[in-house]
């Protein structure tokens, strides 16, 4: 079974896709409202009976606890925010924190992980930088391949694609 630790999943669809594919999912987001929205999407999508743990928590702290508990995951889908403030006023900025977050999350991966998907919707993190991070953190430990590209929204009026972020995936 595949389990996925998801950070902020913009449309909450990645969690549902993993659950629909048969995974046991831990959906982690620091925002109670986002977790509620994701849970509602699961219900509307007919997936409320799937094994999804809905957790309102700081993703990095959650992962650190899972490591201490000896829990492992076969896959991680990460969709972190560009910027955030913690309850104690801590500032989290994607460009400054992403490498360490990926490194921390790699510690909860099983011995035979399947994939690690990283999405970003900030202009400060290009596909090549994201690929480098995944290759450096995961490729050295597990081998595998990394691919990266832009994320875009189709524009019906022009037939073009409006770039809106980046994605990178490491897979075995």
Report each predicted region and the residues it spans:
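S-adenosyl-L-methionine
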Residues: 35-75
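Single conserved hydrophobic/aromatic residue that forms the stacking wall/gate
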Residues: 1-7, 11
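C-terminal catalytic and target-recognition region of SAM-dependent MTase-like enzymes
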Residues: 113-172
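Mobile active-site "lid"/loop adjacent to the S-adenosyl-L-methionine
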Residues: 56, 74-104
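Conserved SAM-binding motif I beta-strand of class I
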Residues: 24-29
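Conserved SAM-binding loop of SAM-dependent methyltransferases across substrates and taxa
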Residues: 13-23
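Helix-to-beta-strand junctions that scaffold the AdoMet/dcAdoMet cofactor pocket
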Residues: 109-111
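Conserved SAM/SAH-binding beta-strand->alpha-helix loop
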Residues: 31-33
């Amino acid at each position: 079974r595949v389990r996925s630790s998801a950070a902020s999943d913009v449309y909450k669809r990645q969690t549902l896709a993993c659950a629909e594919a048969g995974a046991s999912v831990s959906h982690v987001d620091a925002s109670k409202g986002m977790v509620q929205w994701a849970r509602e999407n699961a219900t509307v999508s007919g997936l409320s009976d799937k094994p999804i743990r809905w957790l309102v928590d700081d993703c990095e702290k959650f992962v650190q606890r899972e490591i201490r508990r000896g829990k492992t995951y076969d896959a991680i889908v990460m969709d972190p925010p560009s910027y955030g403030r913690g309850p104690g006023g801590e500032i989290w900025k994607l460009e400054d924190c992403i490498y360490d977050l990926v490194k921390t999350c790699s510690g909860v991966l099983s011995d035979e992980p399947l994939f690690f998907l990283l999405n970003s919707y900030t202009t400060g993190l290009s596909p090549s930088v994201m690929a480098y991070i995944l290759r450096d953190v995961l490729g050295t430990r597990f081998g595998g391949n990394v691919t990266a590209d832009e994320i875009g929204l189709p524009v019906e009026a022009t037939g073009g694609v409006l770039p809106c972020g980046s994605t990178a995936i490491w897979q075995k």
